[in-house]
């Protein structure tokens, strides 16, 4: 241990026991010998109790009170000082500052006059405080900071030179007119005619890792031939009812911006339509989303409805405003985001949020207003639009345009119910809005405070990440990951949509942590001078903690997405979200891998990073089977950037598919330095004809040793104790620990059973029979589906009646999900197969195929006899002569 001269006094234990301290780090000699906790408290500095010192403190306090009254002339200082939490004081004063000082020029003039009237000593104190930016950042959690820029969310940063197009005026122009375009703008690192993507965007990150767009090749998902594109067929009642059912089943539970009872009454012509153009925009957008949620991008049926919706976007539409238009424009923004029209999505969202503000949706109605249904509809629409604003701004690296919210969060109670203690489809948007609102308060405000002079310090990053995790801990119990398996299983049987909501909230939380820490390390690398890099011990420790937390958040994201894919049926909507969060997370190990290659880091860490990258590649290739073009593009980017490492000797080979000749099934394996256990996956429907069993990184255990490697009894005991379990033995947890840092396994999740409505051309227009049930996700609606054994149609309609039944209040919406059994996949062994446990959960899948807990649990006397007396396979004992 090294003696540190900076330690001024003995450790706490030595001072308490009156012992001579060696003043060593991390432990002094006495504490090390007696196994005591060694802690060095800072030396207490006591102020002198003199009249001169008290007079100086009183004068400083008086000037501070005068400054407070000049900035907040209408506030009661005594009332504010009675508040216990410093964070509450900061939030209150920041909100007051925004309300009182909307005009920045007026605020600047006021502060300039305040500075002129300041005494000379106070101005000198302000200058000294500015010069010591590092000290002020360390004391940021104890001091109250009010900033003009932070309050107004003003962004003073300029566009970097490498982001500039050739033409500074017209070079940012963009065009996304082609509805079948294969280009993804944030994968085009060329800044010309691509729009602006700022710091923190995926395009900026791709530039930093050296992605070259000239090596990128466009690739289309194999589209099924659209046999019939007759507009009358696609506009028929039977077709639109199926697509409407798909929207309400596959998308509405996760974005309940549409009031489904009103939607059904409009669809059934039970209420009058105020504007046919506005209704056609909304209705066709819903049909486009419903078609996309069934077949992804394998057909262009959804494009037909999208083009039909655009045809109604006339000049009259933008000369009016309504709730229907706000909802329709928001859904168009969501849809075009999936269809790789990022700038178009941003434009639709801009129209939507500005129109929502013009309708006053960002403010609550008077307390005397008694209709709670209307109040809740307004809140749901606003918070859906607000959450999308934050997500797009972070994704594209563009400024957040909203600075304040005076409207309450929506209620989690359905319109049919009065009170509820269980989950509803509105819990997702409530917790997402709460998470993003807290994030913008604690990160965006603090980020602009330190702007260009000093980046956010490591301590503040850790505080922000802790605040983000604290929000998730305040969520309802059924949305947290530490809920009991039994309780969660019962909830998922009644509410099958809840599983994806829980996972998506976790992914959003981890993506925000990645965003904060990634931005910190970008500034830390670019703006830190050599003098600032010579930090003290606790600063470097906090930077290391940030690095560990960043890699841990990325790894937890990959593990969580893998866990979800292993235990749930995946739809195109789920696949798109999984691929986005996977790609965002894998950029962290890629950046680390490139940094280590420049600094000649250890091969062990490189192998672990490559293993994680290959795991993501494997998952993306599985997601690509769900007809999502974005997955193919992500795979190309990863393979192009990591090609030098994947082809090197230390790289882990990419997943390959080996076919079993007996049954034609495909099994994917990863070959690497560490053995990765396989565990079964739930059968996927409507994906392909090959049953794929792929390796998951969730379980890492010892590789099984050969059954016969010696002839002694001790060797027999050793081998039998390590023998892999038979199919009749229970699945146990591997006794070895992974070589990399372990991640807390995710708790049990039942398979999420989705009521999908296939929309292939054969299914729509004849030639296929399907057995599907049809329930709408909304609690007050139900569709009646009938199966025809002799006809090709999924829905049998009457000539003189509507295809959809009238809305009916139902206490149980998902009765068809209650009777479904979760079946595990089978392990193929020649011609014999035996199913595993019928109730797979995330935890059992995570710990699958471990070694047996006992020594002879799966051993029979035949095994012992064959081991001892089978001379054909048993080699002679080398010690025996």
Swiss-Prot record:
<dbReference type="Pfam" id="PF04082">
    <property type="entry name" value="Fungal_trans"/>
</dbReference>
<protein>
    <recommendedName>
        <fullName>Regulatory protein GAL4</fullName>
    </recommendedName>
</protein>
<dbReference type="InterPro" id="IPR036864">
    <property type="entry name" value="Zn2-C6_fun-type_DNA-bd_sf"/>
</dbReference>
<dbReference type="GO" id="GO:0042802">
    <property type="term" value="F:identical protein binding"/>
</dbReference>
<feature type="binding site">
    <location>
        <position position="38"/>
    </location>
    <ligand>
        <name>Zn(2+) 2</name>
    </ligand>
</feature>
<dbReference type="GO" id="GO:0045944">
    <property type="term" value="P:positive regulation of transcription by RNA polymerase II"/>
</dbReference>
<dbReference type="GO" id="GO:0005634">
    <property type="term" value="C:nucleus"/>
</dbReference>
<keyword id="KW-0539">Nucleus</keyword>
<dbReference type="GO" id="GO:0000431">
    <property type="term" value="P:regulation of transcription from RNA polymerase II promoter by galactose"/>
</dbReference>
<dbReference type="GO" id="GO:0017053">
    <property type="term" value="C:transcription repressor complex"/>
</dbReference>
<dbReference type="InterPro" id="IPR005600">
    <property type="entry name" value="Gal4_dimer_dom"/>
</dbReference>
<feature type="modified residue" description="Phosphoserine">
    <location>
        <position position="712"/>
    </location>
</feature>
<feature type="binding site">
    <location>
        <position position="21"/>
    </location>
    <ligand>
        <name>Zn(2+) 1</name>
    </ligand>
</feature>
<dbReference type="GO" id="GO:0061629">
    <property type="term" value="F:RNA polymerase II-specific DNA-binding transcription factor binding"/>
</dbReference>
<feature type="binding site">
    <location>
        <position position="28"/>
    </location>
    <ligand>
        <name>Zn(2+) 2</name>
    </ligand>
</feature>
<comment type="function">
    <text>This protein is a positive regulator for the gene expression of the galactose-induced genes such as GAL1, GAL2, GAL7, GAL10, and MEL1 which code for the enzymes used to convert galactose to glucose. It recognizes a 17 base pair sequence in (5'-CGGRNNRCYNYNCNCCG-3') the upstream activating sequence (UAS-G) of these genes.</text>
</comment>
<dbReference type="Pfam" id="PF03902">
    <property type="entry name" value="Gal4_dimer"/>
</dbReference>
<feature type="binding site">
    <location>
        <position position="14"/>
    </location>
    <ligand>
        <name>Zn(2+) 1</name>
    </ligand>
</feature>
<dbReference type="GO" id="GO:0000978">
    <property type="term" value="F:RNA polymerase II cis-regulatory region sequence-specific DNA binding"/>
</dbReference>
<dbReference type="GO" id="GO:0001228">
    <property type="term" value="F:DNA-binding transcription activator activity, RNA polymerase II-specific"/>
</dbReference>
<dbReference type="GO" id="GO:0006012">
    <property type="term" value="P:galactose metabolic process"/>
</dbReference>
<dbReference type="GO" id="GO:0006351">
    <property type="term" value="P:DNA-templated transcription"/>
</dbReference>
<dbReference type="InterPro" id="IPR007219">
    <property type="entry name" value="Transcription_factor_dom_fun"/>
</dbReference>
<feature type="modified residue" description="Phosphotyrosine">
    <location>
        <position position="694"/>
    </location>
</feature>
<dbReference type="GO" id="GO:0000981">
    <property type="term" value="F:DNA-binding transcription factor activity, RNA polymerase II-specific"/>
</dbReference>
<comment type="subunit">
    <text>Binds DNA as a homodimer. Interacts directly with the mediator subunits GAL11/MED15 and SRB4/MED17.</text>
</comment>
<feature type="region of interest" description="Disordered">
    <location>
        <begin position="723"/>
        <end position="743"/>
    </location>
</feature>
<keyword id="KW-0804">Transcription</keyword>
<dbReference type="InterPro" id="IPR051127">
    <property type="entry name" value="Fungal_SecMet_Regulators"/>
</dbReference>
<feature type="modified residue" description="Phosphoserine">
    <location>
        <position position="699"/>
    </location>
</feature>
<feature type="short sequence motif" description="9aaTAD">
    <location>
        <begin position="862"/>
        <end position="870"/>
    </location>
</feature>
<dbReference type="GO" id="GO:0008270">
    <property type="term" value="F:zinc ion binding"/>
</dbReference>
<feature type="modified residue" description="Phosphoserine">
    <location>
        <position position="696"/>
    </location>
</feature>
<keyword id="KW-0299">Galactose metabolism</keyword>
<feature type="binding site">
    <location>
        <position position="28"/>
    </location>
    <ligand>
        <name>Zn(2+) 1</name>
    </ligand>
</feature>
<keyword id="KW-0010">Activator</keyword>
<feature type="binding site">
    <location>
        <position position="11"/>
    </location>
    <ligand>
        <name>Zn(2+) 1</name>
    </ligand>
</feature>
<keyword id="KW-0479">Metal-binding</keyword>
<keyword id="KW-0597">Phosphoprotein</keyword>
<keyword id="KW-0805">Transcription regulation</keyword>
<dbReference type="InterPro" id="IPR046347">
    <property type="entry name" value="bZIP_sf"/>
</dbReference>
<keyword id="KW-0862">Zinc</keyword>
């Amino acid at each position: 241990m090294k003696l540190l001269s900076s330690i001024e006094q003995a450790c706490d234990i030595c001072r308490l026991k009156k012992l001579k301290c060696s003043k060593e780090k991390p432990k002094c000699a006495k504490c090390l010998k007696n196994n005591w906790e060694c802690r060095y408290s800072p030396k207490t500095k006591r102020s002198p109790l003199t009249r001169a010192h008290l007079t100086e403190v009183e004068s400083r306090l008086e000037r501070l009170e005068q400054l407070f009254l000049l900035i907040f002339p209408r506030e009661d200082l005594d009332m504010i000082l009675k508040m216990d939490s410093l964070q509450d004081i900061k939030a209150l004063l920041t909100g007051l500052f925004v309300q009182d000082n909307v005009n920045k020029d007026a605020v600047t003039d006021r502060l300039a006059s305040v500075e002129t009237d300041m005494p000379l000593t106070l101005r000198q104190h302000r200058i000294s405080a500015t010069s010591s930016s590092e000290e002020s950042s360390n004391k940021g959690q104890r001091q109250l900071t009010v900033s003009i820029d932070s309050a107004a969310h003003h962004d003073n940063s300029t566009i970097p030179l490498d982001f500039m197009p050739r033409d500074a005026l017209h070079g940012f122009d963009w065009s996304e007119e082609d509805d079948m375009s294969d280009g993804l703008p944030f994968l085009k690192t060329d800044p010309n005619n691509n729009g602006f993507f700022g710091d923190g965007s995926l395009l900026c990150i791709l530039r930093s890792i050296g992605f070259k767009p000239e090596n990128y090749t466009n690739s289309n998902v194999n589209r099924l031939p659209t046999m019939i594109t007759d507009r009358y067929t696609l506009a028929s009642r039977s077709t639109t009812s199926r697509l409407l059912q798909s929207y309400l089943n596959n998308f509405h539970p996760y974005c309940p911006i549409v009031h489904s009872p009103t939607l059904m009454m409009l669809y059934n012509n039970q209420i009058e339509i105020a504007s046919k153009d506005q209704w056609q925009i909304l209705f066709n957008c819903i049909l486009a989303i419903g078609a996309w949620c069934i077949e992804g991008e394998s057909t262009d049926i959804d494009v037909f409805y999208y083009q039909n919706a655009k045809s109604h976007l006339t000049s009259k539409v933008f000369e009016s405003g309504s709730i229907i238009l706000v909802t329709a424009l928001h859904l168009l923004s969501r849809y075009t985001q999936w269809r790789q029209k990022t700038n178009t999505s941003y434009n639709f969202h801009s129209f939507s949020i500005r129109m929502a503000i013009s309708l006053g949706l960002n403010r609550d109605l008077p307390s005397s207003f008694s209709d709670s249904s209307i109040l809740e509809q307004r809140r749901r629409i606003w918070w859906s639009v607000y959450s999308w604003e934050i997500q797009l701004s972070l994704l594209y690296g563009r400024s957040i345009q909203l600075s304040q919210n005076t409207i309450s969060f929506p209620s989690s109670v359905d319109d049919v119910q009065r009170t509820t203690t269980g989950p509803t489809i509105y819990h997702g948007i409530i917790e997402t809005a709460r998470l993003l609102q807290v994030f913008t308060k604690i990160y965006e405000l603090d980020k602009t405070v330190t702007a260009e002079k000093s980046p956010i310090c490591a301590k503040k990053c850790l505080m922000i990440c802790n605040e983000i995790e604290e929000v998730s801990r305040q969520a309802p119990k059924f949305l947290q990951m530490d809920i009991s398996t039994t309780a969660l299983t019962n909830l998922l049987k009644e509410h099958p949509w809840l599983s994806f909501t829980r996972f998506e909230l976790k992914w959003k939380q981890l993506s925000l942590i990645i965003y904060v820490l990634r931005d910190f390390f970008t500034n830390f690398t670019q703006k830190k001078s050599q003098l600032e890099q010579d930090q003290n011990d606790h600063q470097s420790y906090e930077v290391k903690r940030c690095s560990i937390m960043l890699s841990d958040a990325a790894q937890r994201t990959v593990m969580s997405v893998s866990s979800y894919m292993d235990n749930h049926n995946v739809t195109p909507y789920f696949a798109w979200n999984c691929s986005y969060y996977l790609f965002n997370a894998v950029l962290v190990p890629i950046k680390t891998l490139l940094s280590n290659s420049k600094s000649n880091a250890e091969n062990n860490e490189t192998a672990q990073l490559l293993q994680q990258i290959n795991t993501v590649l494997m998952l993306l290739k599985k997601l690509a089977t769900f007809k999502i073009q974005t997955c193919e593009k992500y795979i190309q980017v990863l393979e192009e950037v990591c090609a030098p490492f994947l082809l090197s000797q230390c790289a882990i080979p990419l997943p390959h598919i080996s076919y079993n000749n007996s049954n034609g099934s495909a099994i994917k394996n990863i070959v690497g330095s560490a053995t990765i256990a396989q565990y079964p996956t739930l059968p996927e429907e409507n994906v392909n004809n090959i049953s794929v069993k792929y390796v998951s990184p969730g379980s890492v255990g010892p590789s099984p040793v050969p059954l016969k490697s010696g002839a002694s009894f001790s060797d027999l005991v050793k081998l039998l104790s390590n023998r892999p379990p038979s199919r009749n033995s229970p699945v146990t947890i591997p006794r070895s620990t992974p070589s990399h840092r372990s991640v807390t396994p995710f708790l049990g999740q039942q398979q999420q059973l989705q009521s999908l409505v296939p929309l292939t051309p054969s299914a729509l227009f004849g030639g296929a029979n399907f057995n599907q049930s049809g329930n709408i996700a909304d609690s007050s609606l139900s569709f009646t589906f009938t199966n025809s054994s002799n006809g090709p149609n999924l829905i049998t309609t009457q000539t003189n009646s509507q295809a959809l039944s009238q809305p009916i209040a139902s206490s149980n919406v998902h009765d068809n999900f209650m009777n479904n059994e979760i079946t595990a996949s089978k392990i193929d062994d020649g011609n014999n197969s035996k199913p595993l446990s019928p109730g797979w959960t995330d935890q059992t899948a995570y710990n699958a195929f471990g070694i047996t807990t006992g020594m002879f649990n799966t051993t029979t006397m035949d095994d012992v006899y064959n081991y001892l007396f089978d001379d054909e396979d048993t080699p002679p004992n080398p010690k025996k002569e």
